[in-house]
From Swiss-Prot:
Residues 1-25, 74-117 are annotated as: Disordered. The lineage of its organism: Eukaryota, Metazoa, Chordata, Craniata, Vertebrata. May interact with the N-terminus of HD. One of its GO terms (molecular function) is DNA binding. Disulfide bonds: none annotated. This is Huntingtin-interacting protein M. InterPro entries: Histone-fold, Histone_H2A. Transmembrane segments: none annotated. One of its GO terms (cellular component) is nucleosome. Residues 1-11, 83-97 have a biased composition (Basic and acidic residues). Gene3D superfamilies: Histone, subunit A. It comes from Mus musculus (Mouse). The gene is H2ap.
């Protein structure tokens, strides 16, 4: 147990200002941050108002990210639909080249049955 206590740093050591560019980027899942804030494991270091603020900020950022992703998906979907319509118009204008040499077309008469009766 004494090893664990010696490894933990008190909150007062966190007062040193660290250059953010010197730290490697850390990617932490939103659920993990939310759970930590809910469990209030860092209560001795941050006050309840700070915890509330961070939770509100996390909710706001999550909503914003979802809104941006949704609008991007809608824009991409609309672009794909307009491109599909342009392709369809181009295909309607020119007959298909693969069927030019076919001995029949879709509008020819249906041949009669081969057997009678």
């Amino acid at each position: 147990m004494s090893e664990k206590k010696s490894q933990e740093k008190p909150c007062s050591d966190n007062n040193q200002i660290e250059d953010p560019s010197s730290r490697p980027e850390v990617q932490v899942p939103v659920n993990y941050v939310y759970r930590i804030l809910q469990e209030e494991q860092y209560t001795p270091c941050i006050g309840s108002t700070t915890s509330d603020f961070l939770l509100a900020m996390l909710d706001y950022l999550t909503d914003y990210i979802l809104e941006v992703v949704g609008s991007e998906a809608n824009i991409n979907n609309q672009q794909n639909i307009s491109q599909d319509r342009e392709r369809q118009r181009d295909n309607d204008r020119e007959p298909s080249r693969g069927f030019k040499n076919a001995p029949f077309s879709l509008f020819d008469e249906m041949p009669g049955p081969r057997r009678n009766g």
